[in-house]
Amino acid sequence: TAWTFLKAMQKCSKKREARGSREAPETNFPDTTEESAQQICCTRDSSDSKSVPRSERNKKGIQCQGEGSSRGSQPGQFVGVTYNLEKRPTTIVLINDTPLNVLLDTGADTSVLTTAHYNRLKYRGRKYQGTGIIGVGGNVETFSTPVTIKKKGRHIKTRMLVADIPVTILGRDILQDLGAKLVLAQLSKEIKFRKIELKEGTMGPKIPQWPLTKEKLEGAKEIVQRLLSEGKISEASDNNPYNSPIFVIKKRSGKWRLLQDLRELNKTVQVGTEISRGLPHPGGLIKCKHMTVLDIGDAYFTIPLDPEFRPYTAFTIPSINHQEPDKRYVWNCLPQGFVLSPYIYQKTLQEILQPFRERYPEVQLYQYMDDLFVGSNGSKKQHKELIIELRAILLEKGFETPDDKLQEVPPYSWLGYQLCPENWKVQKMQLDMVKNPTLNDVQKLMGNITWMSSGVPGLTVKHIAATTKGCLELNQKVIWTEEAQKELEENNEKIKNAQGLQYYNPEEEMLCEVEITKNYEATYVIKQSQGILWAGKKIMKANKGWSTVKNLMLLLQHVATESITRVGKCPTFKVPFTKEQVMWEMQKGWYYSWLPEIVYTHQVVHDDWRMKLVEEPTSGITIYTDGGKQNGEGIAAYVTSNGRTKQKRLGPVTHQVAERMAIQMALEDTRDKQVNIVTDSYYCWKNITEGLGLEGPQSPWWPIIQNIREKEIVYFAWVPGHKGICGNQLADEAAKIKEEIMLAYQGTQIKEKRDEDAGFDLCVPYDIMIPVSDTKIIPTDVKIQVPPNSFGWVTGKSSMAKQGLLINGGIIDEGYTGEIQVICTNIGKSNIKLIEGQKFAQLIILQHHSNSRQPWDENKISQRGDKGFGSTGVFWVENIQEAQDEHENWHTSPKILARNYKIPLTVAKQITQECPHCTKQGSGPAGCVMRSPNHWQADCTHLDNKIILTFVESNSGYIHATLLSKENALCTSLAILEWARLFSPKSLHTDNGTNFVAEPVVNLLKFLKIAHTTGIPYHPESQGIVERANRTLKEKIQSHRDNTQTLEAALQLALITCNKGRESMGGQTPWEVFITNQAQVIHEKLLLQQAQSSKKFCFYKIPGEHDWKGPTRVLWKGDGAVVVNDEGKGIIAVPLTRTKLLIKPN
């Protein structure tokens, strides 16, 4: 009973006082399964309340009916005055400065003073007419008198009835003024509540309660009555406008459970940093002789909620057919589903347990939510005393640890694991799959396997995961394959034969062994001499630019981080690859932050061919490959440096397949052990040099890998769009292009021309001024190797001849391999200035025999048109000054300058780089953001102590900005109204700033029918676009500050520069892209209006499939999807993003 416990605690307290120590009491706890006495507690309402706290009572020497006060292991820590209801709850109060022993009666509405006590008062007031009291003995006559009551520093003046009754009664009228409460639950007033605040500018939830069925309503009322009687909830005040709906579910036991939807409230609460970053793992426990697992009952209901925050937790109990007004309540303790409940609970429990941890640093005490693990190496008696003391500390604060959930005998169930003193296991689980599984069933199965993989080495999920490919809805049926069933059976066999894993020994080093399964899953185990501590697995990424070694190197970092988190040390790694492979990866290793200590064993299967790839050209043969399509048929071709060519028709294949087959064909045909492969396919080059590594014999890349294995060294090079080797060209053209590739690949001052133009352009290496009648020799870094039976001819360009520049380059013989120099003479009337990068001469490769003639006919057409001689270039030098003026005024981007003034992009970039305001400052981190027409992002930025609200359209980059006087809801709303008046936004994305999430702004956006979402900077679906726009806008504002008097003027000029003076998509300005999009929207609306009366048709693509289907009739079209009748799957819904609507086809 509670009396036995209190007496035992008093006895232990006296023993500790006699010893002068702070040891735990040695008494046992009362059996909570037996009928325990109810208790009445006088507790404090707030920090300044002085009504009947136990600590105050002990200082005064006041006890209840001779009952001794009970202390726990911490002096000065008390729950309050506790009265066993087997005896009368009495206390001593001062009435008119007279100490009187009174009865606490929470069932009495009015306090009554006995006649005997009235006569003992030091001073008495006037008598007033009283009211009759109807009791067991009949009607009792009374009169009332004014009294002054003092208790623990609190004074109240009131009237009490005086009657001839056996004992003075303090009823609810005076008990309430004294701050006393009847508490039947564990809600502890000894625990100080934590302050909870709403985000600035937000309000509490006001969501109406939805109807509940009669059965659920009866269950809810029953639960509410119990919570109300236990003090866990209270009736809401009449002026409380907040509400969050409740719902009721039935548990497996048949009992009802009340839940509250607090999602809207959670959005408005100021949330701090998460303090529980993961579950503790048994592999990190240190082996100990004795263990105990405790469970804290009704954990949330023990901790009081901030009284100022309680109104926001209000909920409503409705009635059937509005039979009576709704009843409304608020939570007094932490509610389930509240975002801060876990944080407050764990933080509170952490502070309570901290003194225990400091006293016993050698004891392992793990706290995760309401589960506690205690491990020690002392005697069994000492361990038991530790548990008794720990339970006493918790009970003093109101936390009960029920005996029925106290685990003192192995095996112990803890966080899904089974613990024994010698080893640990994952709790036994049989993996089963239903006959016709859905996506949800498979995902649950994969979650169970992933959970068990840390305790059962070797579990795999690759084939099981493959069954979910193409499935989007949770209830969608999946095709359960034989491979998946076999993998499931193998996993069950491993679980059945799983052995217990070991605990961590801090005196020994750890070893991590990594292996690769036949399914290309990386598995690992962490070991010490006593055995395996834990295990894990990771599905390796294939065909994503991730080689096997790269996968494993990143896995090492993951395991090292995991190990440091669990035991504070990094293990030594035993890996299935060589040091050479690691060094090869380290050359590309920007993704490696550090490497742990590694023990190398052997090479990874299927990855040794990578060691044959080199970074520099070899001395062997060079082969140029290309693939293409002609009339729907793929063609692969290659040409070697010794003049050999080959073409092969491939049938109906993709362009990428043709490129890959050309490389495969070149490797197969050459006998050389050292080979240089040059391709213009970035796809093939990237895959071969970085992307492969997990391929087997079934892979289309396998022949290339096998051929690389047979070589000594292979060099792969990529050149962008080299000429010639295309599907419809002959072998002799391929040979010619080989030489052009060689010319184009040498030096930086040689540029390709149009396909129909001969030769290459030579560029000026640096700025040169050529006076009138002066001759200069201009060097270049261009080197060529003239092919056999050919010569090179350096000559002038017509655009240079217009200015009077005469080129005397001359002939380059077949054997010449030096740098090209160009002799230039100014025969004009003014000085000529040549700018770096300017095309001033050309190089043409000719055969020795070129006397063939061909008649002219009408088929001779040209990309040049009929402009003739001198029309290749424009005399753009004259436009440089105008372009410089343009950039000085508007800070226009290089591409816009080049387009508007017909100057080379190199010159435009030089103009921009000479501007001190337009120097590039780098860019922020990239994010994954939504981009679509009429989808905007907004953010506030600060410059010169002023606030700028920036809107940017995500598709075009068009910027609209305005100055705000204050960063509040009112100013933001006015700016949004102006923005909505000028444009037609459909959606807006902002951060979680107080002005954006304020209720007026949210309601305004709803009224304007603008979808509003929020996020975190540089996070997926965030406002990364507007962040970059803010940086650009600030740069442009600073560029214009020298020419303006106010920030407002500079802002407007900067907006003109950003929207009309820089390029966006396709070389157009953001303004042009935005206007084009709006015109297209209007055009599409007109087309839809015209097609409104006709039946709609569409092409569509089913998720998980690659081919388009249709055209087919649209049965129904909604805002986000269409319904069509598919031949294979029947009537289905297809997202609009996977459809192309059209009018009925002919």
Swiss-Prot record:
Location of the Peptidase A2 domain: 100-174
Residues annotated for Zn(2+) binding in this entry: 887, 891, 915, 918
Modification note: Specific enzymatic cleavages in vivo yield mature proteins.
Superkingdom of the source species: Viruses
Coiled-coil residue windows: none
Keywords: Aspartyl protease, Cleavage on pair of basic residues, DNA integration, DNA recombination, DNA-binding, Endonuclease, Hydrolase, Metal-binding, Multifunctional enzyme, Nuclease, Nucleotidyltransferase, Protease, RNA-directed DNA polymerase, Transferase, Viral genome integration, Virus entry into host cell, Zinc, Zinc-finger
Biased composition (Basic and acidic residues): 45-59
Segments of the chain annotated as binding DNA: 1096-1144
Domain Integrase catalytic: residue ranges: 921-1078
Reaction(s) catalysed (UniProt annotation): Endohydrolysis of RNA in RNA/DNA hybrids. Three different cleavage modes: 1. sequence-specific internal cleavage of RNA. Human immunodeficiency virus type 1 and Moloney murine leukemia virus enzymes prefer to cleave the RNA strand one nucleotide away from the RNA-DNA junction. 2. RNA 5'-end directed cleavage 13-19 nucleotides from the RNA end. 3. DNA 3'-end directed cleavage 15-20 nucleotides away from the primer terminus; 3'-end directed exonucleolytic cleavage of viral RNA-DNA hybrid; DNA(n) + a 2'-deoxyribonucleoside 5'-triphosphate = DNA(n+1) + diphosphate
Region of interest: Disordered: 13-77
Start-end of Integrase-type zinc fingers: 878-919
InterPro entries per UniProt: Aspartic_peptidase_AS (IPR001969), DNA/RNA_pol_sf (IPR043502), dUTPase-like (IPR029054), dUTPase-like_sf (IPR036157), dUTPase_trimeric (IPR033704), Integrase-like_N (IPR017856), Integrase_C_dom_sf_retrovir (IPR036862), Integrase_C_retrovir (IPR001037)
Residue ranges of every copy of the RNase H type-1 domain listed in the record: 617-740
Family per record: Belongs to the retroviral Pol polyprotein family.
Name of the protein described by the UniProt record: Pol polyprotein
Encoding gene, per UniProt annotation: pol
